[in-house]
UniProtKB/Swiss-Prot annotation:
The gene is INS. This is Insulin. Residues 57-87 form a propeptide. Disulfide bonds join C31-C96, C43-C109, C95-C100. SMART domains: IlGF.
Length: 110
């Protein structure tokens, strides 16, 4: 009987010290189908929207020029905004080449 009480106490302490569900997803590499499945899990019913860079360029060849302030408009982006646009990375670069958190994945949800 004392052994069972000791075992239950140890199990309770392990449960308290174990990672909770909010912290279980820290930062990880996600590529290919693992990335897509994780996005489905994170976004759930909201879904997500993603156009690969190659396809986006085929649909609108001026998208990069406009994003970087080289297209038509009122003089393009300011220097700080231009620098941030140059550093902007897609989800594959962010999560497959590097690592991403649950919060970063949620930014790709609709």
């Amino acid at each position: 009987m004392a052994l069972w009480m000791h075992l239950l106490t140890v199990l309770a302490l392990l449960a308290l010290w174990g990672p909770n569900t909010g912290q279980a997803f820290v930062s990880r590499h996600l590529c290919g189908s693992n990335l897509v499945e994780t996005l489905y899990s994170v976004c759930q019913d909201d879904g997500f929207f993603y156009i690969p860079k190659d396809r986006r360029e085929l649909e609108d060849p001026q998208v990069e020029q406009t994003e970087l302030g080289m297209g038509l408009g009122a003089g393009g982006l300011q220097p700080l905004a231009l620098e941030m646009a140059l550093q902007k990375r897609g989800i594959v670069d962010q999560c497959c080449t590097g690592t991403c958190t649950r919060h970063q994945l949620q930014s790709y949800c609709n």
